């Protein structure tokens, strides 16, 4: 009987699909001042998995979020001023976003979903953004530098 139960358990483990892990929820604060100085997203880098949700939460007035570079096939997104905004990230890749009123102060961030399949395309597009960053322009390279390579 014990052998039968062990065989049955093994067979079920092989046959039945693995239960997918529940999607994670990430919160990104939009701040006038944070640990990295003025006009920041906190955290400025999020590592997520496909299906996770990201909620941007303004903690001060005059902030909103807009995507700048997203994986191929993903629709760009833009929130309303001073309102929380949630996006579900379904495709692997790097998502670069910013706060339009504070772009010149390099209020930018990165979401990495799974493997960074579009990292080179994001880097190329980011170069076009660089001249608009009047202050704290190093934040762009710092954010991109946090992206972990595909494994």
Where are these regions (language model features)?
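Positively charged n-region of N-terminal signal peptides that target proteins for export
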Residues: 1-4
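Bacterial N-terminal signal peptides
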Residues: 7-17
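Extracytoplasmic copper-binding redox domains, predominantly the cupredoxin/blue-copper superfamily
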Residues: 21-151
């Amino acid at each position: 009987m014990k052998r039968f139960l062990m065989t049955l358990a093994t067979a079920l483990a092989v046959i039945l699909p693995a239960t997918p892990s529940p999607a994670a929820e990430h919160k990104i604060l939009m701040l006038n001042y944070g640990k990295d100085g003025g006009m920041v997203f906190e955290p400025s880098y999020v590592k997520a998995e496909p299906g996770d949700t990201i909620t941007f939460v303004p903690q001060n007035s005059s902030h909103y979020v807009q995507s700048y570079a997203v994986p191929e096939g993903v629709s760009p997104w833009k929130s309303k001023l001073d309102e929380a905004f949630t996006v579900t990230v379904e495709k692997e890749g790097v998502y670069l976003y910013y706060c339009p009123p504070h772009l010149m102060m390099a209020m930018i961030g990165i979401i990495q979903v799974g493997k960074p399949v579009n990292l080179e395309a994001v880097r190329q597009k980011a170069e076009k953004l660089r001249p608009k960053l009047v202050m704290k322009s190093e934040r762009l390279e710092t954010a991109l530098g946090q992206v972990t390579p595909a494994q």
